[in-house]
């Protein structure tokens, strides 16, 4: 027997598969662009930008909120001292451009630098013409870059590394690193980061660059095992230009789509070269918050060679960086324990299809129809199995070519803008505006992918265009899944090499197959549940228990203001933070998370101020 190894009010998300989302999230409304004004780009963007910046700074210096509001197409307010146009690159300089993705609504875009009482940062503005020659802010985005007096320890502020001259008993670099990473003699990290994947690594690195002691702990034996131990054929579906990590770029010969084992090696090198403190083979046994001291008591069990040690740490912050998902989602279906085939497991436990089984004509059923399901089905086909994907609802499918060339190609490509500029451009749009643009982007992707989508639907595989037809990005942000970025399995489905069982829930697992609610049956020697994961809070409950988890807010999705919920911000429990997402999201938001912690540590602000 096998064993289970803007100002528009947001509305509640509807139930259709294309609109399904994580619990508690709201469906982001679609912003309306200003009506088309000019028919050409004959605008002096420099003059327009300079004029509105001058007016903005004048109003702010006088604390004239009415004058500030008059510069916006919609009312808003800001606490800034001044802004200045950023002309450090052609990409950042003021330019006339279309802002609606349809080449209809002309606007002026420019990057700017900003200053507040406690810090400096960057911003991105898009202007729209509301009258003949009258320009106002359509979108206005600001991002904190540095805290005054607490700048990152990079470039001209990098550490010296060694003090030259005679010094009795001086330790060399390797000895100093060993001492620093062990936290002996009562030393404690300021932050404990749980998980050493892309989320944990980026958070710890950002904190290190701000001079904050952070310790990464991971239950795996090696950094990178969170990728290394996944299924055999896994390759990143996003292109290399989108996936860069902060402070350390991929080599110029790096492949466009990164194999999982190669990424694992890079993670291990990243942790070593950036001198991150990492304890692998380490698990939390208890974690308690002391309200009086505003600190945690975290007890961990750590394997070191043939021995095991128990350590107690007292950090002031804990970051859960175990991925933006929680416990694996395995439906409780009648008969699962009676399955007599060779394997039944969740996709997280699947390593590879077995070629010797494929040669015997074995049958595999994959429950689910998103990225992991397709990759695993693809692997089974290549090993000679008869394969069926069980698709219960619909899936958004887009080719990796469309993602690379259309969805991301404008910003992330060879010779494109820096990732810092591209990130600011990408995240510098309010979610409703981003959704409006993505509706158009999704249509362009579908046009490129027309033959692929027709082939899938003819084969019985049902596709959708995502929430409000906004495609991949909003499937990810509102649901955390529900999509497949095609790297080859779509053709296998269209050609009939991967069969599809569509639209039926499973009523029972049989000894050698599956029975559906309509009474039909599917033979299977192996069953893989590619059914995703539960909310990130479920992992919090496992690690920290109900006492902590009950105070945490729902994670992921959007709130009433169309902002992401709980991630990278106040979690509902002091000293507790969530961080996760793909490599690009971790790259961007890790800095904002680290700056919040630095601000708390330096007394620049307190819990509840942000």
Spans of model-derived segments:
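Surface-exposed, charged secondary-structure patches
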Residues: 5-7, 74-128
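A short, basic/flexible loop-to-alpha-helix module at the beginning of a structural domain
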Residues: 164-189, 344-361
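Short beta-strand edge/turn micro-motifs at domain boundaries
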Residues: 8-28, 103, 111-181
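Glycine-rich active-site loop/strand segments that organize a redox cofactor
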Residues: 76, 228-265, 396-463
């Amino acid at each position: 027997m096998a064993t289970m190894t803007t100002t528009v009010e947001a509305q509640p998300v509807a139930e259709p598969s294309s609109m399904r989302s994580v619990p508690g999230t709201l469906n982001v409304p679609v912003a309306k662009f200003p009506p088309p004004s000019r028919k050409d780009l004959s605008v002096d963007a420099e003059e327009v930008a300079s004029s509105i910046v001058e007016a903005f700074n004048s109003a702010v210096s006088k604390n004239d909120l009415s004058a500030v509001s008059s510069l916006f197409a919609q009312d808003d307010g800001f606490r800034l001292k001044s802004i200045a146009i950023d002309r450090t690159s052609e990409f950042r300089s003021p330019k006339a451009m279309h802002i609606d993705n349809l080449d209809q609504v002309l606007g002026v875009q420019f990057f700017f630098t900003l200053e507040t009482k406690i810090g400096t940062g960057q911003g991105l503005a898009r202007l729209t013409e509301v009258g003949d020659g009258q320009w106002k802010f359509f979108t206005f985005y600001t991002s904190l870059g540095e805290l005054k007096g607490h700048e990152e320890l990079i470039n001209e502020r990098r550490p010296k590394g060694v003090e030259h001259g005679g010094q009795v008993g001086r330790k060399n670099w390797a000895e100093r690193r060993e001492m620093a990473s062990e936290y002996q003699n009562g030393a404690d990290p300021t932050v404990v980061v749980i998980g050493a994947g892309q989320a944990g690594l980026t958070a710890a690195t950002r904190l290190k660059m701000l001079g904050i002691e952070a310790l990464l702990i991971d239950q795996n034996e090696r950094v990178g095992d969170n990728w290394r131990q996944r299924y055999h054929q896994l390759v990143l579906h996003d292109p290399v230009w989108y996936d860069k990590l902060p402070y350390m770029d991929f080599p110029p010969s790096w492949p466009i789509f990164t194999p999982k084992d190669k990424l694992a090696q890079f993670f291990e090198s990243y942790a070593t070269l950036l001198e991150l403190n990492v304890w692998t083979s380490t698990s939390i046994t208890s974690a308690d918050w002391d309200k009086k001291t505003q600190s945690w008591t975290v007890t961990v069990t750590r394997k070191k060679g043939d021995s095991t040690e128990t350590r107690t740490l007292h950090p002031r912050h804990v970051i859960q960086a175990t991925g933006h998902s929680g416990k694996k989602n395995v439906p409780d279906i009648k008969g699962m324990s009676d399955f007599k085939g060779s394997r039944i497991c969740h996709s997280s436990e699947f390593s590879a299809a077995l070629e010797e089984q494929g040669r015997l004509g074995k049958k595999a059923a994959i429950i689910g129809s998103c990225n992991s399901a397709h990759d695993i089905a693809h692997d089974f086909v290549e090993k000679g199995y008869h394969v069926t994907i069980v698709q219960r609802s619909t899936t958004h499918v887009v080719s990796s070519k469309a993602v690379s060339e259309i969805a991301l190609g404008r910003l992330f490509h060879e010779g494109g803008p820096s990732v810092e500029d591209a990130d600011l451009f990408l995240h510098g749009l309010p979610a409703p505006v981003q959704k409006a643009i993505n509706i158009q982007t999704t249509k362009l992707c579908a046009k490129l992918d027309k033959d692929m989508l027709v082939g899938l639907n003819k084969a019985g595989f049902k596709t959708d265009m995502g929430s409000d037809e906004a495609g991949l990005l909003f499937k990810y942000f509102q649901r955390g899944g529900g999509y497949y970025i095609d790297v080859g399995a779509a053709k296998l489905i269209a050609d009939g090499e991967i069969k599809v069982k569509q639209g039926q829930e499973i009523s029972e697992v049989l000894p050698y197959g599956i029975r559906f609610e309509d009474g039909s049956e599917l033979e299977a020697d192996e069953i893989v549940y590619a059914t995703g994961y539960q909310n990130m809070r479920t992992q919090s409950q496992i690690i920290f228990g109900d006492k902590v988890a009950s105070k945490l807010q729902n994670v992921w999705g959007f709130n009433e203001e169309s902002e992401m919920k709980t991630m990278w911000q106040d979690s509902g429990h002091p000293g507790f933070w969530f961080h996760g997402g793909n490599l690009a999201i971790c790259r961007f938001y890790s800095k904002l998370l680290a700056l919040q912690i630095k601000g708390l540590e330096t007394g620049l602000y307190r819990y509840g101020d942000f």
